[in-house]
């Protein structure tokens, strides 16, 4: 059995602050489950161009608000209780809300190692 808290993760390299968000990588590749679970806080008033070329991601919003935009310009408001799935390695814009952070639980397949970091200075977007 694996039991971990957000507090436990903050003292490890599986707590990643990549500028526009923080991510607690609660379950990673080394745990052998075949997927990762992350608790991510997308900071209010931030925009990140992202793409997961090596992972599929499902996100469930547990608090706050924000939005995700696909590369066709479709904008999807995300609030508590909403889910979005990047099932085609979709490049996307991830935005925190205007007044509130967006809090997500994310599932990655295949799993993350836990130390991946977004690099937001690439005009083509951050990928891993």
UniProtKB/Swiss-Prot annotation:
Pathway in which this enzyme or protein is active: Amine and polyamine biosynthesis; ectoine biosynthesis; L-ectoine from L-aspartate 4-semialdehyde: step 3/3
Gene3D superfamilies on file: Jelly Rolls
Keywords: Lyase
EC class name: lyase
Domain of life: Bacteria
GO biological process, one term: ectoine biosynthetic process
EC number(s) stated in the UniProt entry for this protein: 4.2.1.108
UniProt-listed CDD domains: cupin_EctC
Reaction(s) the record says it catalyses: (2S)-4-acetamido-2-aminobutanoate = L-ectoine + H2O
NCBIfam families the record matches: PRK13290.1 (NF009806)
Similarity field: Belongs to the ectoine synthase family.
Protein name: L-ectoine synthase
């Amino acid at each position: 059995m694996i039991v971990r808290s957000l507090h436990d993760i903050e003292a490890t390299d599986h707590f990643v602050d990549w500028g526009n968000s923080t991510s607690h990588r609660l379950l990673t590749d080394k745990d052998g489950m075949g997927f990762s679970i992350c608790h991510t806080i997308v900071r209010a008033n931030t925009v990140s161009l992202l793409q997961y070329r090596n992972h599929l991601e499902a996100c469930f919003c547990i608090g706050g608000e924000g939005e995700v935009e696909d590369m066709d310009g479709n904008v999807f408001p995300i609030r508590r209780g909403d889910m979005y799935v990047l099932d085609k390695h979709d490049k996307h814009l991830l935005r925190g809300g205007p007044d509130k952070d967006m809090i997500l639980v994310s599932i990655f397949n295949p799993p993350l190692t836990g130390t991946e970091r977004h690099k937001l200075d690439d005009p083509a977007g951050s990928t891993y």
